[in-house]
């Protein structure tokens, strides 16, 4: 029931970390869209494990195989089915997790809720599930590209190291020039050094991703319970390890007066615009035509390669030192996931908007 995301553009995902594969079925994708499978694969490659010394060493090709809904390079309007086969599972690395619960992981809650859990890499709770989101998000990006809408995310903070400027202060073309996916080369090196240091200690660290959506038309959003920022927040907080979401000035707005926070309108050659964009491109839950920007906070990954106190499945106190291949920081690989969830949300709400008037 809750393995599906979206209203009109709708993804249903399936698969587990150490199962045979991860895939999905997409309903509501418009017909006639040229499907650039190379682009879809490039998006998956940005999420793929083993892409740098900062990420998990698990080696997966993550080659997407489309099963339906595409004919002669174009979408047919029928459900698009796809799968990515798992090829490099090391399930024995998780044998020591079968009888114990990892602190702050989904192990305990899954077991209590369902009475059973897949301890191999976390099963369905693994971030490997996000493969399906990246594929669907890549297709959504292809559709949005025809509408002049672009979505870009980047790492803006790792631990205490953060970018002080806004997205407009940086050359976003530099994001893919470093392993951290940060548009500031100097800060990127500091962030990478910190992640590498933490990884060497067997620990993990969190941080923040910033995302900006450009070219979004006025009018996307469905008040009162379908506000665009609420939909984006729901999308982002469904991502593994995501802990907080803010858009526009967010919490910074607490320190501002209304006269400072308000985005004053003006007439720009017949087009109504605002001098500022503290609202983050959304007013009253509806896009106003300005850039939409938001931030997503990710916690440190729960699986540590150092000893921690925990309990076993019988409730007896014990200790755990995880084995296996794990990321020390989720942020570099989460960039395409955040973009994908944003793309799916915007396309879905664009299609929803077409139902409001005859």
From Swiss-Prot:
It is an enzyme of class 4 (lyase). GO terms for molecular function: chorismate synthase activity; FMN binding. Pathway: Metabolic intermediate biosynthesis; chorismate biosynthesis; chorismate from D-erythrose 4-phosphate and phosphoenolpyruvate: step 7/7. The keyword Transferase does not apply. This reaction introduces a second double bond into the aromatic ring system. HAMAP family: Chorismate_synth. This is Chorismate synthase. It comes from Bacteroides thetaiotaomicron (strain ATCC 29148 / DSM 2079 / JCM 5827 / CCUG 10774 / NCTC 10582 / VPI-5482 / E50).
